[in-house]
From Swiss-Prot:
Lineage per the UniProt record: Bacteria, Bacillati, Bacillota, Bacilli, Bacillales
Protein name, as recorded: 26 kDa protein
Induction note: Under acid-stress, this protein is expressed at a higher level in wild-type B.cereus than in the acid-sensitive mutant strain NB1.
Superkingdom, taxonomy of origin: Bacteria
Length: 20
């Protein structure tokens, strides 16, 4: 479950960077 949480955070960071 922790791996999913970490992936979710990383995905959010990537999405934020892409949006920027």
């Amino acid at each position: 479950m922790k791996l999913i949480a970490k992936t979710r955070i990383l995905n959010t960071l990537v999405f934020s960077a892409a949006g920027k």
